[in-house]
Amino acid sequence: MSLLATVLLLWGFTLGPGNTLMLDSGSEPKLWAEPQSLLEPWANLTLVCAVDLPTKVFELIQNGWFLSQVRLETQVLSYRFSLGAITSNNSGIYRCRCGVEPPVDIHLPALNKWTMLSNAVEVTGKEPLPRPLAHADPVDWITPGGLPVYVMCQVAMRGVTYLLRQEGVDGVQKPDVQHKGTAGFLIYKPGNYSCSYLTHAAGEPSEPSDIVTIKMYASQAPPTLCLMGNYLMIYPQKTYETLACKAPRNAAEFQLRQGGKVLKIHGFSPTRDAILYYVNLKELDNPGPFTCRYRMHKYMHVWSEDSKPVELMWSDETLQAPVLTAEPSSRDLEPGSTVQLRCTAPVSGLRFGLQRQGKPELVVVQMLNSSGTEAVFELHNISTIDSGNYSCIYMEQAPPFSGSSSSEPVELRVNGPPPKPRLEALWKSTVHLGQEAIFRCHGHVPRVSMELVREGFKTPFAVASTRSTSAYLKLLFVGPQHAGNYSCRYTALPPFTFESGISDPVEVIVEG
């Protein structure tokens, strides 16, 4: 896997199972509307589907249901679907997709023969015109005397006039930048903003977009610092650890720090808003927590707030192994109870790590610093997913930072069925044809892969990896075929292999 792909996976940009042959930058085509006349936009309308890489096959989908497919003799970058006059028969929400031709002659699964679905285009045939989409870019906050941000307004119909309004302020703001169906408005003041558009000067404005709230912060928001990979692993030959620092917007410079000390470690930036640090554990004179911060072009005198701290552990396994005990000591534990795992060492003033055996790696799941000779780790509200073999390890907090080998393992066995997540529907009552159905799956532990499953189907309809205990799952383009009962479940990310139960179902009722 490439370094950039690793970083993207770490921060949540994942593909569904079996999608390794899908297109990357060209995987999502663009769809927009071109009226014959902006004076009467619904009198004769054409939808244009464009893709980054040439193809012979284009498909137009209305209200989540197949409508039209064309196969051309030669490869092209776009195709025009003529809808004509818009009536109740051809109004609705449209998306398109394009055929994928692999660079070599190989067999592709059915789903991998198509790009991702395009953006949605709403065609109503009436006024007011459909609302545009609006969002803040690159962040939804500003600082005193700092860089402005944009409110971006996206309209599916080309050639329109864009308008931005601030709540409580008279008048409209005209765009500062404009390109291919998107306009950007520079924002210098906090407030609530919405955009709309006109097809001609005497026309009625469209419905306003959803509100975009721009906040005022006293300083640049902190970046995120995290360990590359799902868990920390300790082994005697390990000399380097990789930390990733990601800013909320493009940065000119990053710093990796321990307390007030800036570490002179060269970093590599795969993107303008992120940097990777390769930390030589042998050269550290302090095992204390790491933080990172950034500063931006034109504002080099102002540093952001520090990230949340990240602690590391390593060990040369030269010191005596600690002893791990469990309270209660029974291997048969009841779900919902609390277990204390006590790690005892022969000396004081150490950093302790609780390890859990994966397949095959032994990884650190908790860390504690102690001024005494022991540390007590707690597992709360335990369930079958906590069953496994645990051990502990420690390291000195003064040079040369020697460490122990792992303790003898302690097995925890929790009774009962696996825990069930909770599936939440983020809509009310019914889902209209062509809309998205967005769910949120609430689990119990972080670092899992969550799946949306439908009654009667084995293959999940959506998959999302998360470093937290919940994830959003969505049906992108709901058609009549999507009606039914849905549940969610989750499985551990490597190196663990546990699986949750199935949530109670949520019914999707499709209207229209």
Swiss-Prot record:
GO cellular component, one term: extracellular region
GO biological process, one term: growth hormone receptor signaling pathway
Assigned keywords, A-Z: Disulfide bond, Glycoprotein, Immunoglobulin domain, Repeat, Secreted, Signal
Disulfide topology: C49-C96, C153-C195, C245-C292, C343-C392, C441-C488
InterPro entries in the cross-refs: A1B_glyco/leuk_Ig-like_rcpt, Ig-like_dom, Ig-like_dom_sf, Ig-like_fold, Ig-like_Receptors_ImmuneReg, Ig_sub
Source organism, top-level taxon: Eukaryota
Keyword flag DNA-binding: no
Residues of the Ig-like V-type domain: 22-126, 127-219, 220-312, 313-415, 416-512
Signal peptide stretch: 1-18
Induction: Induced in hepatocytes during the proliferative phase of liver regeneration. Induction requires a continuous pattern of GH (growth hormaone) secretion and an intact GH-GH receptor-signaling complex.
Glycosylation site list: N44, N89, N192, N369, N381, N389, N485
Name used for this protein in its record: Alpha-1B-glycoprotein
Organism of derivation: Mus musculus
